[in-house]
Curated annotation (Swiss-Prot):
InterPro entries: Sec-indep_translocase_CS (IPR019820), TatC (IPR002033). It holds the Pfam family TatC. GO terms for cellular component: TAT protein transport complex. It comes from the Bacteria. Keywords: Cell inner membrane, Cell membrane, Membrane, Protein transport, Translocation, Transmembrane, Transmembrane helix, Transport. The chain crosses the membrane at residues 40-60, 82-104, 125-145, 172-192, 210-230, 233-253. Part of the twin-arginine translocation (Tat) system that transports large folded proteins containing a characteristic twin-arginine motif in their signal peptide across membranes. It comes from Synechocystis sp. (strain ATCC 27184 / PCC 6803 / Kazusa). Forms a complex with TatA. One of its GO terms (molecular function) is proton motive force dependent protein transmembrane transporter activity. Belongs to the TatC family. This is Sec-independent protein translocase protein TatC. The keyword rRNA-binding does not apply.
Amino acid sequence: MSTQLDNITSAETAPDYLDEVPDDVEMSLFDHLDELRTRIFLSLGAVLVGVVACFIFVKPLVQWLQVPAGTVKFLQLSPGEFFFVSVKVAGYSGILVMSPFILYQIIQFVLPGLTRRERRLLGPVVLGSSVLFFAGLGFAYYALIPAALKFFVSYGADVVEQLWSIDKYFEFVLLLMFSTGLAFQIPIIQVVLGFLGIVSSEQMLKGWRFVILGAMVLGAILTPSTDPLTQSLLAGAVLGLYFGGIGCVRLLGK
């Protein structure tokens, strides 16, 4: 009888298997800093390679990004303006192309400190984050940018001729695309917060009024244009993602 009680007690006091950190190795602060420095240098080197590679093929990228503007003509208003635009496009594209490698370096740095339970969430979070980011880029390219440009062109069509600075155009397009990609990460943040038990799905749902206000503010901040149509489209997408994130958290039972 006493042996059975001892077994029950030991089973209750044993650490949960999912909460264990596998292959836990003690490292000093300097070891962590050295590894962080190595990961950063590898990521920066990869970005540099990606930027150079994208710069070689930058003209097709520029032409592809000009498609939403339709028949609008672009001007180079200063010497070297198109060159610096090309560098900017290559920079954004290089980071995007090398983002899987950068993400891999981040995972390798944080992985040793994660429990088995947390590692089970890592794969779906990384995959979902990547899919949502590229979905955000596509939403901006195919929906937000054409809507904003159509508004601007039609608003002044009978007053001014549409001749745009190529630098200002690409600043608008690149900023809108990447800010939309970041805004599409909202469900991932919700899932992580729900999984960690910081916020429940009920708490997320109770604050829907503040979420609507926050979505409108976020749409105004993230869109470089000031037209209400683009801001409303982005705000609507943010709201849809937020309530979709609540559904995902509920599926986790949180």
